[in-house]
């Protein structure tokens, strides 16, 4: 499915924009601060309900306006789908799909699977475990129908359990929460483990093409001891959890560790190599989704040229083309993407929030 049309109103520095898009490559060219990243962010927000540069809705609404409006048309193999998102300064959202209101953000995310590659995306590799959990959870969300509901319930129960830890004196008082929490935690951990195994070969093959000089390994850690029932862990950790006032073990502490030649990648790879690895992982994840479900990702790439030399840019471009997916690329100069452009591409110039093609 590709985004054939995008309407933006009062988002960041963009007052109004109506863009007819290519199902292939779409290039956004402009100086720093011109608004090219804002276009990528509008697409991301349309599919996620939040921006990738700010979690506060008021910061992405254009100055002195009350709300932003985003609208898109998605073209699938058999039908077109109309989607829309409005969000005000208080953070209240309205999702519209095919002209009807009352839909959930998760429905947009399902309709628009996308991979985001930004200069800040190194956090996948050198940031905390939450970024790598999010990587696995993206895959589980798009591959397991029940994942989002289970994940939402897990978050709710953990919040309630942590609040209860401040009030209880005996473990038996926590059992009502743990009775619900334990099967959810085990199911989510099983899904994550199965996904990490299923995608391992895709990641290894893509990383070998991008970084043949390294031997990369991937390992999923579920957030509590191996071969130990989660129920036993919770009961045994009660006194410590009560002192900490939070649950110290569980799927919310899981990690997906990546090593190069036996050492953490953040200690071994250069910034250019880390960017290649990040791109390889995102590509592998998108290609796995296509093979398993027949659905294609949208790829959003901010500041395409940064950290990469000509040869590496060429390698990334050729792999992106091979996906036959829709790709949005922001660059400062068109010279950086001239070799990627073809008769099906579209080139947009962005200047002070105004977009022309």
From Swiss-Prot:
Record keyword Lyase present: no
Biological process terms in GO annotation: DNA replication; DNA synthesis involved in DNA repair; double-strand break repair; SOS response
GO cellular component: cytoplasm
Record key words, sorted: ATP-binding, Cytoplasm, DNA damage, DNA repair, DNA replication, DNA-binding, Nucleotide-binding, SOS response
Protein's cellular compartments: Cytoplasm
InterPro entries per the UniProt record, alphabetical: DNA-binding_RecF, DNA-binding_RecF_CS, P-loop_NTPase, RecF/RecN/SMC_N, RecF_2
Transport as UniProt keyword: no
Domain of life: Bacteria
Record: residues binding ATP: 30-37
Main location: cytoplasm
GO molecular function: ATP binding; single-stranded DNA binding
Described purpose of this protein according to its UniProt entry: The RecF protein is involved in DNA metabolism; it is required for DNA replication and normal SOS inducibility. RecF binds preferentially to single-stranded, linear DNA. It also seems to bind ATP.
Entry's family note: Belongs to the RecF family.
NCBIfam families to which the protein is assigned, alphabetical: recf (TIGR00611)
Name the UniProt record assigns to this protein: DNA replication and repair protein RecF
Native source organism of the sequence: Salmonella schwarzengrund (strain CVM19633)
